């Protein structure tokens, strides 16, 4: 699955070695001569970084080497990924950053999920006949753009835990955007596949110079993005949420049919949340609460599967995949019916994880038979309250988004697990002219047809699947897991945990083990490596796995060995990611 190329990167040395008046800068050592020479697995005594792009990993690792903590490194990495993976995340989007504070032992989530503008309406994704506008159309319109939260989230994280300033941490990414870097295979493929979307906006001048898509090995220069980063460096987040940039951003959204105003940007705020917790085979799991559906349904699936002693079956047996698929169908049915922004709707968290409800769902799973009509259950029987919404059938035409996940741990015990996104590849494709910021299409994560828990409302956050997760043993963090991939995120995190803990696989093997995803009887995916005879058996039972495998997710993970004092980082081979361990010289 690993995509490689052999373009010399030594010219980047001048980009990443930052000089100037600021006393501390994140820097990167002279990179190897090709991206594929970076390690997907590394070990460190003093910290670890694992991201989906080697240059972002270098920048984060350099923060740790120079005395910054995991939160400082995470902020620097997010800016770097905005440059190196512009199709996946950035300051035009949002995300969920989970932080374990090594000093206080508290685990906290910075929720920078985008919000709908004040002008958003429940029916804004319906046509004049009251029918849902096709996903392919609504995904590129201004109505799809949510008020971005990433920058506010980074600011809050630094205020709470940081030891370096945003001014310092953004500088290497300014240099990277100004001077450029060689495009890798993942970005090149994205530009080629989405050139029609990019050609409609200011993005064409960046990614399609002279009308032709940039290719692998070409240098990507983003001078307008560098200019925006410089504004943020000098004026802070107000440079984004107020003033000339805010006006240009909101005007651009309106030009593409949206309603966002400067006031929407000025009024945006993040939330600081506690994780939702669960137990699994002696581990305590901290994961994301609503408005992400990721955590609650990760825990629900783990609880359902724990009953079946999954590892009695071979890891690539039809029995294992049958139990996974049936469990996914039930949990994703619940997700579609009961999950939404808790500031607006009642989410039955206790009911969904209640032991009696879990038993009820387990009884619907038969090893030898496919449940042809998996439906949502009634978790409200197991807790007080009731739904303030209906169950509304939605169109089946949504394309799962991308995103990026990265993770950092430092020598002081701080741990970050961070999933961040602009939703689809290149979001809406809309770029803020003269500023180089690509805008998300996050509002298409709302239901197109109103009435359900996830209908569009002003200031509401659309339902997410992002699942940054930290596992604890004896109250100490021992494993971070997360992935991109839209609704597939939950299944990728689930399977990584199952393979590492239930099956006892070494971490890299657990990350690389072929994954499946199915949220209903009409939607199936599987990765290369699932045996053909197993697929035939499953399809003979009534499943509908297709003929072509696809990559599912892109897991980055860190395991922490407290006894030996080591960190092990793993980057998934489905992108050109890198794990970099920190080993400081001892005097």
UniProtKB/Swiss-Prot annotation:
Pathway: Sulfur metabolism; glutathione metabolism
Catalytic activity: an N-terminal (5-L-glutamyl)-[peptide] + an alpha-amino acid = 5-L-glutamyl amino acid + an N-terminal L-alpha-aminoacyl-[peptide]; glutathione + H2O = L-cysteinylglycine + L-glutamate; an S-substituted glutathione + H2O = an S-substituted L-cysteinylglycine + L-glutamate
EC number(s) from the headed UniProt entry: 3.4.19.13, 2.3.2.2
One Pfam family from the record: G_glu_transpept
Highest taxon listed in the record's lineage: Bacteria
Signal peptide residues on this chain, from the entry's feature table: 1-28
Main location: secreted
One Gene Ontology MF term: glutathione hydrolase activity
Family matches, as PROSITE patterns: G_GLU_TRANSPEPTIDASE
Gene Ontology CC annotations of this record: extracellular region
Keyword annotations: Acyltransferase, Glutathione biosynthesis, Hydrolase, Protease, Secreted, Signal, Transferase, Zymogen
Effect of a null allele: Loss of ability to grow with glutathione as a sulfur source.
InterPro entries attached to this UniProt entry: GGT_bact (IPR051792), GGT_CS (IPR055262), GGT_lsub_C (IPR043138), GGT_peptidase (IPR000101), GGT_ssub (IPR043137), Ntn_hydrolases_N (IPR029055)
Propeptide: 29-35
Keyword hit for Signal: yes
Active-site positions on this chain: 403 (nucleophile)
PTM description: Cleaved by autocatalysis into a large and a small subunit.
Functional description taken from the UniProt entry: Cleaves the gamma-glutamyl bond of extracellular glutathione (gamma-Glu-Cys-Gly), glutathione conjugates, and other gamma-glutamyl compounds. The metabolism of glutathione releases free glutamate and the dipeptide cysteinyl-glycine, which is hydrolyzed to cysteine and glycine by dipeptidases.
Family of this protein: Belongs to the gamma-glutamyltransferase family.
Subunit comment: This enzyme consists of two polypeptide chains, which are synthesized in precursor form from a single polypeptide.
Protein name from the UniProt record: Glutathione hydrolase proenzyme
Species whose genome carries this gene: Bacillus subtilis (strain 168)
Organism placement in taxonomy: Bacteria, Bacillati, Bacillota, Bacilli, Bacillales
Gene: ggt
């Amino acid at each position: 699955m690993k995509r490689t190329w052999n373009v010399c990167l030594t010219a980047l040395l001048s980009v990443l070695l930052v000089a100037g008046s600021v006393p501390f800068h994140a820097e990167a050592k002279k990179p190897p001569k090709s991206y594929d020479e970076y390690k997907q697995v590394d070990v460190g005594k003093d910290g670890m970084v694992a991201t989906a792009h080697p240059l972002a990993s270098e920048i984060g690792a350099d923060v740790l080497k120079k005395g910054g903590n995991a939160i400082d490194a995470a902020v620097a990495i997010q800016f770097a990924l905005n440059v190196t993976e512009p199709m996946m995340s950035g300051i035009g989007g949002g995300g969920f950053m989970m932080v374990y504070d090594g000093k206080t032992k508290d685990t906290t989530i910075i929720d920078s999920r985008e919000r709908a503008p004040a002008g958003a309406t429940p029916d804004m994704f319906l046509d004049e006949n009251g029918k849902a506008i096709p996903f392919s159309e609504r995904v590129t319109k201004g109505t799809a753009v949510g008020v971005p939260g990433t920058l506010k989230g980074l600011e809050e994280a630094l205020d709470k835990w940081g030891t370096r300033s945003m001014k310092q941490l953004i500088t290497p990414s300014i240099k990277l955007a100004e001077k450029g870097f060689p495009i890798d295979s993942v970005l090149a493929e994205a530009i080629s596949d989405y050139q029609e979307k990019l050609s409609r906006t200011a993005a064409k001048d960046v990614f399609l110079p002279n009308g032709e898509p940039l290719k692998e090995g070409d240098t990507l220069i983003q001078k307008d993005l560098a200019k925006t980063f410089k504004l943020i460096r000098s004026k802070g987040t107000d440079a984004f949420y107020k003033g000339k940039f805010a006006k240009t951003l909101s005007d651009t959204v309106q030009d593409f049919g949206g309603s966002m105003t400067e006031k929407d940007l000025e009024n945006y705020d993040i939330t600081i949340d506690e994780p939702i917790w669960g137990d699994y085979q002696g581990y305590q799991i901290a994961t994301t609460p609503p408005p992400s559906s990721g955590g609650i349904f990760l825990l629900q699936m783990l609880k359902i599967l724990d009953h079946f002693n999954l590892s009695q079956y071979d890891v690539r047996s039809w029995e294992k995949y049958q139990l996974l698929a049936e469990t996914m169908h039930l949990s994703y049915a619940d997700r579609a019916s009961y999950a939404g922004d808790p500031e607006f709707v009642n989410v039955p968290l206790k009911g969904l994880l209640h032991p009696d409800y879990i038993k009820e769902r387990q009884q619907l799973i038969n090893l030898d038979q496919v449940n042809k009509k998996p439906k949502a259950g009634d978790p409200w029987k197991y807790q007080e309250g009731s739904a303030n919404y209906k169950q509304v059938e939605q169109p089946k035409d949504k394309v799962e988004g991308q995103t990026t996940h990265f993770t950092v741990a430092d020598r002081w015990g701080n741990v970050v697990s961070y999933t961040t996104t602009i939703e689809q590849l290149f979001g809406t494709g809309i770029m803020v002219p003269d500023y180089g910021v690509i805008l998300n299409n996050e509002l298409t994560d709302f239901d197109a047809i109103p009435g359900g828990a996830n209908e569009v409302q002003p200031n509401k956050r659309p339902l997410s699947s992002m699942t940054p997760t930290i596992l604890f043993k004896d109250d100490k963090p021992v494993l971070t897991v997360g992935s991109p991939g839209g609704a597939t995120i939950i299944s990728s995190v689930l399977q990584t945990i199952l393979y590492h803990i239930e099956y006892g696989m070494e971490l890299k093997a657990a990350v690389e083990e072929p994954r499946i995803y199915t949220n209903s009887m009409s939607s199936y995916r599987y990765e290369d490596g699932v045996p053909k005879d197993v697929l035939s058996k499953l399809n003979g039972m009534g499943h509908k796995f297709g003929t072509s495998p696809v990559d599912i997710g892109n897991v980055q993970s860190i395991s922490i060995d407290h006894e030996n004092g080591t960190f092990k980082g793993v980057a998934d081979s489905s992108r050109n990611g890198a794990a970099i361990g920190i080993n400081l010289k001892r005097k």
